[in-house]
Amino acid sequence: MSKKAFFITGTDTDAGKTLVATGLLAAARLRGLSTLGLKPVAAGCTRTEQGLRNSDALALQAQSTLPVVYEQVNPVALEAAIAPHIAALQEKRSLSADRLAGFCRSSLRQADFTLVEGAGGWRVPLNPSETLANLAQLLRLPVVLVVGMRLGCINHALLTVEAIRNDGLPLVGWVANVLDADMPVLEENIASLAQRIPAPCLGVVPRLSMASADAASAHLDLTPLLDA
C-alpha cells in the first residue's frame, strides 16, 4: 500500500476534529500501519516545564506510532485560546501557509498513514491574505471533513464542502460527530448530509460517555481512505 496523507478540517471550532483524527489514527494502527498526526498551528496552549503544549496536539502525538518529539507534531504553539492569527499578533509572531507547509512536508511521507489537522474551520485566517485552506492547497492533500452534529450543521457542512471543492482539493470523506445527543431528527440530518455531500461517510461517532481515540475508532471506516 502506498503511503496515505489527509488534511482534517471541520465545520467549526469544537466540531470534533481531534477526536475523529485520533480515532482514524487508532484504526490505522489496528491495521498494522505506522501512523503520524500533525497539528501545524495550535492556539490555546498551556505553559509547562517543557514549553507550550496543546491538548489536541498531545492527543495526536499519543496516537502516532512514530517516535516524534512534540515540536514535530505542533511546530507553532500559541498560548491564547483565540483565533490563531490574532493569537500570533498578540505574541508578535507571524504565520504563513508556506512556513507551515515547510514544517509538514518533511514529515508527510514518514508514516504509512498521516493526518494533518487544521485549527477551527476551513477559512480560519493565518494572516491578512491567507487561511488554513492555503496550507491544505500547498500540501496538496485530500480532505476529510468533520461535521459537528448540532442545529445548523447542514448549512455549515455544505458551505464548507463548496469551499473545499472551489479551492481545488478533493473531499474524500466526511464524519458525522454527534455533539448534541438530544439533537432533534438527528438521523434525518445525517441522511440529508449523506444525500448532498459528494463523498463517502466514514462513520457516525455518537456522543461518547468516555471520549477516546479507541472508542471513536470503533465507529469509523478507514477503507475509503485507504482505497483513495
UniProtKB/Swiss-Prot annotation:
Listed GO biological process terms: biotin biosynthetic process
EC number in record: 6.3.3.3
UniProt keyword annotations, A-Z: ATP-binding, Biotin biosynthesis, Cytoplasm, Ligase, Magnesium, Metal-binding, Nucleotide-binding
SUPFAM superfamilies documented for this protein: P-loop containing nucleoside triphosphate hydrolases
UniProt binding sites for ATP: 14-19, 56, 117-120, 206-208
Catalytic reactions on record: (7R,8S)-7,8-diammoniononanoate + CO2 + ATP = (4R,5S)-dethiobiotin + ADP + phosphate + 3 H(+)
GO cellular component annotations of the record: cytosol
Named cofactor requirement(s): Mg(2+)
Localization of this protein: Cytoplasm
Gene3D superfamilies linked to this entry: P-loop containing nucleotide triphosphate hydrolases
Record-annotated active site: 39
Task performed by this protein: Catalyzes a mechanistically unusual reaction, the ATP-dependent insertion of CO2 between the N7 and N8 nitrogen atoms of 7,8-diaminopelargonic acid (DAPA, also called 7,8-diammoniononanoate) to form a ureido ring.
HAMAP family: BioD
Family to which the UniProt record says this protein belongs: Belongs to the dethiobiotin synthetase family.
Name of the protein described by the UniProt record: ATP-dependent dethiobiotin synthetase BioD
Species whose genome carries this gene: Cellvibrio japonicus (strain Ueda107)
Biological classification of the source: Bacteria, Pseudomonadati, Pseudomonadota, Gammaproteobacteria, Cellvibrionales
Gene responsible for this protein: bioD
